[in-house]
Structure formats: structure tokens, C-alpha cells
Amino acid sequence: MPNSQAKKGLFQFYPHNLIWLGLSVLAIVLDQWTKWIASTHMNYADPVPVLPFLNWTLLHNYGAAFSFLSDAGGWQRYFFTSLAGLVSILFVFWLLRMPKKMVVLPVAIALILGGALGNLIDRITLGYVVDFIHVYYQNHHFPAFNIADSAITLGTILLLIDTFFLEKQRPKNSDA
């Protein structure tokens, strides 16, 4: 007799995965809070030294990562907004379908999702992304970034670790 409790199909999800959405929300809240602090307490493009290799520098990014396409004429705002929205929807479905025994992969997806939505909020409400973390060494400057970018980067690193090292150790059929 088939299990009537078995969840199948596109909208299958497991309640235990709501905790991962909580991690995404935490990333969004932390990102938006720090951007608000930077925007209300800093002057645009005026560096505030923190450490010998770190400044807080309020900047507006009209492009993608590292200001890619920031001077492309305006179409990139709609492109990146649409792309982030679509990827976020796919990530929510993927996240909610994670088997219970998995940890690294859902953390990775939750961080990427939270970072993408944090920057998406900026694009929709401001037309640009607020960046304020500026790391440098002598005359070598890394492009300014924010907490959302950090969440996306950490999530991507965890996703690569999961893909290349942990996936091989998982049983083929992991149940939730």
C-alpha cells in the first residue's frame, strides 16, 4: 500500500526546511540594517578608516558584482532585478525540498538566497545597490561590497564544497 504521507511533485516541501528560510531572512535583515546605517551615517564616497586594510566607504553600485555593467545605460537594472527574482524563486523551491540529513547545501542556498534578495530589495527600492565595505592592501583595492555580497560569496564557497567533496558521500536516495 503506497504511503499517503509521501510528498511528491513540484510543490513538495518539508517543514524542517523553514529554518533555512529563517537563515535567509537573517541575512536580509542584517544586510538591510547595515546598509541603512551606512546610508544614514556616512557621506558618499568619503572613506572612514577602520583597520589598516579596511575602510567603510558608502558607494552606489548600478551594475552587478564588482560594478560589472554599471555604465551600461540603465537596462541592466531591469535585467539584474529580473534575474535575481527568478533565481530567488528557484532557490526557495530548491531549499524547501532539501532532505533532512543535509546541512551544508541548504545553508549555502539559504545564504545565496538571502544575499540575492538583500541586493534585490536595493535594486527595486533605490535603483542601485548600496556598498560600503572597502578592503585594500597598499594601492591594491578590492571593489566595495556589502553583507549581501558576503552572504552570496560564503554560500557559493559552501555550495562548491558540497558539490566537490560532500555530494560523493551522500546516499543516492536521501529521504527527508
UniProtKB/Swiss-Prot annotation:
One of its GO terms (molecular function) is aspartic-type endopeptidase activity. The chain crosses the membrane at residues 10-30, 48-68, 78-98, 102-122, 141-161. It catalyses: Release of signal peptides from bacterial membrane prolipoproteins. Hydrolyzes -Xaa-Yaa-Zaa-|-(S,diacylglyceryl)Cys-, in which Xaa is hydrophobic (preferably Leu), and Yaa (Ala or Ser) and Zaa (Gly or Ala) have small, neutral side chains. The active site is at residues 131, 149. GO terms for cellular component: plasma membrane. Pathway: Protein modification; lipoprotein biosynthesis (signal peptide cleavage). Keywords: Aspartyl protease, Cell inner membrane, Cell membrane, Hydrolase, Membrane, Protease, Transmembrane, Transmembrane helix. InterPro entries: Peptidase_A8. GO terms for biological process: proteolysis. It is found in: Cell inner membrane. Its EC number is 3.4.23.36. It is a multi-pass membrane protein. Pfam families: Peptidase_A8. NCBIfam families: lspA. PANTHER family: LIPOPROTEIN SIGNAL PEPTIDASE. This protein specifically catalyzes the removal of signal peptides from prolipoproteins. Belongs to the peptidase A8 family. This is Lipoprotein signal peptidase.
